[in-house]
Curated annotation (Swiss-Prot):
SUPFAM superfamilies: Putative cyclase (SSF102198). This is Uncharacterized protein HI_1016. Keywords: Membrane, Transmembrane, Transmembrane helix. GO terms for molecular function: arylformamidase activity. One of its GO terms (cellular component) is membrane. InterPro entries: KFase/CYL, KFase_sf.
Length: 142
């Protein structure tokens, strides 16, 4: 972190520049990220990002291990009822235990899972891999 300004007689605020690698934090990919004619993030209405029916599913995964269709099939009845699903892999433990593994070898949603979800769950608007911040990690997947 680099300090840009600090509070003094001339500057009434403090600010920093933070540098972090992409995929270390929160972001969303719209369908245009993977589908040539899909909507871009700025074309989606704000309501698309608001969800009342949300689930946290436990899908344990290791280093660079994909979440597959087979991992999600046991949750079919639940997925049919929600508009957003978080997938808890247990990988958040590496955030403090081994930050390099956390940053570079995280689990991912495999093509088979993406196709399965898009083909079978039209009400599902989003899927995310649950990576809680450090202070919250002890409460995840319990």
């Amino acid at each position: 972190m680099i300090r840009c300004t600090d509070i003094n007689e001339i500057t009434p605020f403090s600010s920093f520049i933070s540098k972090i690698p992409n995929h270390c934090g929160t972001h969303m990919d719209a369908s245009r990220h993977f589908v040539k004619d899909g909507l871009s993030i700025n074309e989606l209405p704000i309501g698309y990002f608001c969800h009342k029916d949300v689930v946290l599913l436990e899908v344990p995964k290791g280093e660079a291990e994909g979440i597959t269709k087979e991992d999600l099939e046991p949750y079919a009845a639940i997925l049919a009822q929600v508009s957003f699903a978080f997938l808890c892999t247990g990988f958040e433990k590496y955030r403090t235990e081994n930050p390099l593994i956390y940053q570079n070898e995280g689990p991912y949603i495999a093509t088979s899972a993406g196709k399965y979800l898009s083909d079978n769950y039209p009400n599902l608007k989003g899927v995310g891999i649950w990576f809680p911040c450090t202070w919250f990690a002890v409460f995840s997947c319990t």
